[in-house]
Amino acid sequence: MKIKVGLIGFGRMGQMYWEEMQKSGRWDIAYICDTDPASRELARNLSPSSRIISDEQEIFDDQSVEAVGLFALANSRKEQIEKAVRSHKHILTEKPIADTIDKEWEIVDLIEKYDRIAAVNLYLRNSWYHQACLLY
């Protein structure tokens, strides 16, 4: 059974996630949301089976959507994560999870009590130990 997901943000990172989700075959990408008309047009061309929207609230309101992918700008993520929690969705978000450290800690506090999966895509390619591994 595929996981029904709505993607919010279809810029570079949203497109990369969309591509990997397509490859895996485990995802039903029901919605792609972006405020930019050019990004929505690209999404229509790349993902004709997805519903292309400009209002993210449709994703949160759709009870059949199990997960959200948050790939828009960091200044929108705290509110989006809060909406996802209120609507009982699993969360896959790009980093950072908010645009200030205080907001990030508020999200951490919220997510620690959450009964769904909440994952932050935190690339490790810049960490010292990853760089050391690449030398060998």
Where are the model-predicted features located?
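Short, Asp-centered acidic motifs that coordinate Mg2+ and/or phosphate
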Residues: 31, 66-67, 117
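Short helix-capping segments at alpha-helix termini
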Residues: 24-26, 87, 112-116
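Short beta->alpha connector loops
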Residues: 11-13, 73-75, 124-126
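N-terminal Rossmann-like dinucleotide-binding module
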Residues: 1-47
